[in-house]
């Protein structure tokens, strides 16, 4: 496994060659390669990478913290915790930012430009053989101007499931995000109301989401 700095002309292929602020994943024990920056078949991010998390990663705490912040404190969809029975069998995915928060980032939450490792979350779960759902998709409020994060999380989620064996990949998408998903090769199946919030049940076009090379771990990742 090697570290990749996509913003430089040269590629750093060792931990020592990667700047400290560029490699929160390396500092957390996660290797980084080119596929982790993928956003689509033809586009990559230059600031964010996307990772399946393992239970021994200290990024797991950031994953749960961001989920709670978005779905409990901000959206009030849940009261104290957004965790449910699916988390016991789901695979957590996190988006990482590389470097300090810049002046182009909305700092309305008062982060004060502090470094934030986990800036986006999503989970995937196989509810039946080869039937996958994505859920709990969210982006840190200070980074929502960066459409790359949501795009990269969706790409990572669907391509991972497609690589592990997937005939259908579904998600319940809040109404305000339906247009964004349609641009990413999803189709709406039906409109739903969940906890008083309008959603669409949507399905990904698997022919667009090239199966990822990452092998399915033998043990579940959530701790």
Residue ranges and their predicted role:
Residues 87-89, 128-130, 195-199:
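Short acidic/glycine-enriched loop/turn segments that link adjacent beta-strands
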Residues 2-92, 96-102, 117, 213-218, ...:
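Short amphipathic alpha-helix that is part of the acyltransferase structural core
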Residues 139, 145-159:
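Conserved acetyl-CoA-binding loop-helix of GNAT-fold acetyltransferases
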Residues 175-198:
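Conserved active-site alpha-helix within GNAT-family acetyltransferase domains
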Residues 161-174:
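Conserved GNAT acetyl-CoA-binding A-motif
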Residues 94, 104-109, 114-126, 130-138:
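Conserved beta-strand in the GNAT
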